[in-house]
Amino acid sequence: MAATDFFFAFVFSFALIFGFSFAGDPYVSYDFTLSYITASPLGVPQQVIAVNGKFPGPVINATTNYNVHVNVLNHLDEPLLLTWPGVQMRRNSWQDGVLGTNCPIPPNWNFTYDFQLKDQIGSYFYSPSLNFQRASGGFGALIINNRDLVPIPFTEPDGEIIFIIGDWYTQNHTALRRILDSGKELGMPDGVLINGKGPFKYNSSVPDGIEHETVNVDPGKTYRIRVHNVGISTSLNFRIQNHKLLLIETEGRYTSQMNFTDFDVHVGQSYSFLVTMDQNATSDYYIVASARFVNETVWQRVTGVGILHYSNSKGPASGPLPVSATDVNHPWSAMNQPRAIKQNTSASGARPNPQGSFHYGQINITRTYILRSLPPTKINGKLRATLNGISFVNPSTPMRLADDHKVKGDYMLDFPDRPLDEKLPRLSSSIINATYKGFIQVIFQNNDTKIQSFHIDGYAFYVVAMDFGIWSEDRNSSYNNWDAVARSTVEVYPGAWTAVLISLDNVGVWNIRVENLDRWYLGQETYMRIINPEENGSTEMDPPENVMYCGALQAMQKEQHHSSATKSMTNGQLILIFSMMMVLLSSFSSFC
């Protein structure tokens, strides 16, 4: 009997180590090695950033409330951070993966991110946040599934398909950095990739020898298609020839379900659609991601083309590509599409209660921030991009770490809540000092000449209005105060504004940035610091034990000594191992 007890104790402990949780929230673990490989997505050999040798990287697939551990080993020749746009990192900005909250991972070092997907579902991605590296890869999809007890507001699809799309240059990120550092714009991209591959040869303008994406499907089946634009600066129109896209979700919120023939996906955005394979199989069908709001004749090469292949298809796709239904020469017509996106107020989200049960439209606004972007300008002889006349310079010590160790003068809490036209553009480490549990509105005013995407870490905000012109207080009467969708990345058209509402219930330091990589690199960002003055450990987590130190705290950083075969263990895993040892010792004592 004692031997049997010992055996079951061993099995139980073994299961604990390998992630089978009998109590609490489960976890999933990933080991990511980021390194350079040579690839030719547009027919030209170039250096790209792979994750575990893959471009794009592996999918992170988890479920609401799961704990996610990602051990990142940096095999690049420069510092690295990974960030997780849209993952809210509740109480835990230490894991956000941007310079304001994390010290970079040096070459040949590793760092383990450890975060919980608290009360979230939906479609997201991960990507590098430093040194323009996203322009060379290092990205992949991040999927958060519903728990079994929370129903989805549509029939379970027959399968899932992920499309990672984005504009692409045949120069790597270091060459593109040099162009921006020299004071020049990047110019037109060399193409668009779909899942890391170039265009199908749909006409003679496409060179021979380019590998394209082919998606195999079965007739009559319905698939959930997740689309992520991880590109540099180009808004893309996504469409599948002769197939309707039924919009169901964006960045963690189920939407009112609407059919589209094509859909604009802006830089940094993620969407889910249901697509039914209801066409005849006389031929394959084109999958297209093409540049928007540009001269399409000049930008013809900036088009990604893949193939949708029915299992009973009788021939290849041929003929011209399907065109977008929206007139790109009239941006106000295109704006009607995002205006039509509404929250499904009767659907459950991450919890069983309806998404619309939080009545944001009935809460008084405590503060308004108008964040204005302009075309890049020269500051101290260098090309820079600004918000409210400030081009952000990251402090040498991450801000929350500086707070924790009482480092003075690292940053300033004086970011203006509206443009200061009387002041010249300047460089600064100025951030927003926001009030915990406040309810703010942020107006993104885009006075640049290009469409932009704005993102706020740590939060989902309600997109209540967008329009052309200059925002003013009297526009509040046009807000959608009932079923606005909540998301983390929103488009702002040139010469236009977008208004969002945010409930400040997540303590930490959170990045506010433009997702267009060229503008972000040039300084178009800031941070929002939200501190609970009565902090007692319940609203913000302590720094992790593996926190890295840099800047004024560099002397606190210990050297890493590890072999490539050694996997980093998280605190949770160490606790499980300790528990296993205790169980084994106890059982062994009884056995003896």
From Swiss-Prot:
Organism: Arabidopsis thaliana
Claim: Signal is one of the keywords in the record: yes
Keywords: Cell membrane, Copper, Glycoprotein, GPI-anchor, Lipoprotein, Membrane, Metal-binding, Signal
Propeptide feature ranges: 565-592
Stretch forming the signal peptide: 1-23
UniProt subcellular location: Cell membrane
Residue ranges that the Swiss-Prot or TrEMBL entry lists as coiled coil: none
Lipid-attached positions, GPI-anchor amidated serine: S564
Residues reported in the UniProt entry to bind Cu cation: H455
Top-rank lineage group of the source organism: Eukaryota
Membrane topology: Lipid-anchor; GPI-anchor
Single GO term (MF): copper ion binding
InterPro entries with a match to the protein in the record: Cu-oxidase-like_N, Cu-oxidase_2nd, Cu-oxidase_C, Cu-oxidase_fam, Cupredoxin, CuRO_1_AAO-like
A single cellular component GO annotation: plasma membrane
Assigned protein family: Belongs to the multicopper oxidase family.
Cofactor dependency: Cu cation
One Pfam family hit: Cu-oxidase_3
Glycosylation sites recorded in the entry for this protein: N61, N110, N172, N203, N259, N280, N295, N344, N364, N433, N447, N476, N536
Transmembrane segments: none
Protein name (record): Monocopper oxidase-like protein SKS2
